[in-house]
Amino acid sequence: MAQFYSAKRRTTTRQIITVSVNDLDSFGQGVARHNGKTLFIPGLLSQENAEVTVTEDKKQYARAKVVRRLSDSPERETPRCPHFGVCGGCQQQHASVDLQQRSKSAALARLMKHEVSEVIADVPWGYRRRARLSLNYLPKTQQLQMGFRKAGSSDIVDVKQCPILVPQLEALLPKVRACLGSLQAMRHLGHVELVQATSGTLMILRHTAPLSSADREKLERFSHSEGLDLYLAPDSEIFETVSGEMPWYDSNGLRLTFSPRDFIQVNAGVNQKMVARALEWLDVQPEDRVLDLFCGMGNFTLPLATQAASVVGVEGVPALVEKGQQNARLNGLQNVTFYHENLEEDVTKQPWAKNGFDKVLLDPARAGAAGVMQQIIKLEPIRIVYVSCNPATLARDSEALLKAGYTIARLAMLDMFPHTGHLESMVLFSRVK
């Protein structure tokens, strides 16, 4: 007769232990050792001692939280944001920018088994040109919450300021809160997005019930008084333009239009430097044929087309392909072809795969580009630039190129999101002759 037992949950004792942190992981957590086990401790820096309690105990590692810090690292800084430690947006405001960059670079070097050649960075504060703020009506107080999610929770931190937002957006926060908090539809608001484009500021309001004419008038007056382009979104697919023209931003000498819901890099400064460095690494020549995979609306594709003989961009989202084609026309680029294809399927039968290319750039999502690596190898490009938002899948995909005879010529850490645990990077692979 079979017997069934419920699995025993590993319990943690609330015993206080003293640890010394000797390293940081890529997420900015302090790393310590206790009784032969690795401990990950948010909020601690290298060279700091602290009393901690274990919150999660696994076979190979444990997580802990600080009870009392006993010493401070010389690289500890006072967080600029009053919400730091509660808001889930930032994890590393307590660390110097230099330490953040060094620890992320070290984590990247360990994963890639290669020295980081450079850090591509820009201003560490006031860099974020897009924000999505959750909205929640509190019946007891009849107040509207507006802010970001708490770390590890769906609760909202009511933010009054956010120093990583570009100054124009941070200055808008109290005004947007006051406007939305005066609407009759307070109970039926989902979130509000703020975007700073070169053309001006956008506000996209998601509402879950129809707005009254009084609310619409109030929002329209607010948009005019603050010089905003206003968009209303009754669901996740539709939005209505209330005021404003098609938004656009400057990028590497080009003017790129975009829809309010289109993905654009939130850090304009690092994006400009990243694109410029990618073109430099590829050493684009007037006779080159260049392939850009996971191209989006042409963040790399269009700048590449200003230097190459021809460029092909491949993207899985049809709206972004359409926007890329439109921006090519607007910028007078006639040597660009965009394809709408799913790069997670069999790419060998896709029309772009029949062409020859001298150089390749790819910028996949977090899942990486496992499905296209063999096709890239078949193309035998001289140089490949891989832009990554996930170092684990980058390391995995790199193995295929290294086995095929490519070498890592350059490796850069992209400081796209200072004060957070996000690690982005860019690699140049060269074919061994």
UniProtKB/Swiss-Prot annotation:
InterPro entries: 23S_rRNA_MeTrfase_RlmD (IPR001566), MeTrfase_TrmA_AS (IPR030390), MeTrfase_TrmA_CS (IPR030391), NA-bd_OB-fold (IPR012340), SAM-dependent_MTases_sf (IPR029063), TRAM_dom (IPR002792), U5_MeTrfase_fam (IPR010280). Keywords: 4Fe-4S, Iron, Iron-sulfur, Metal-binding, Methyltransferase, rRNA processing, S-adenosyl-L-methionine, Transferase. S-adenosyl-L-methionine binds at residues 265, 294, 299, 315, 342, 363. It catalyses: uridine(1939) in 23S rRNA + S-adenosyl-L-methionine = 5-methyluridine(1939) in 23S rRNA + S-adenosyl-L-homocysteine + H(+). Pfam families: TRAM, tRNA_U5-meth_tr. One of its GO terms (biological process) is rRNA base methylation. Coiled coil: none annotated. Residues 10-68 form the TRAM domain. The keyword Iron applies. PROSITE patterns: SAM_MT_RNA_M5U, TRAM, TRMA_1, TRMA_2. The active site is at 389 (nucleophile). One of its GO terms (molecular function) is RNA binding. Its EC number is 2.1.1.190. [4Fe-4S] cluster binds at residues 81, 87, 90, 162. HAMAP family: 23SrRNA_methyltr_RlmD. Belongs to the class I-like SAM-binding methyltransferase superfamily. RNA M5U methyltransferase family. RlmD subfamily. Catalyzes the formation of 5-methyl-uridine at position 1939 (m5U1939) in 23S rRNA. This is 23S rRNA (uracil(1939)-C(5))-methyltransferase RlmD. The lineage of its organism: Bacteria, Pseudomonadati, Pseudomonadota, Gammaproteobacteria, Enterobacterales.
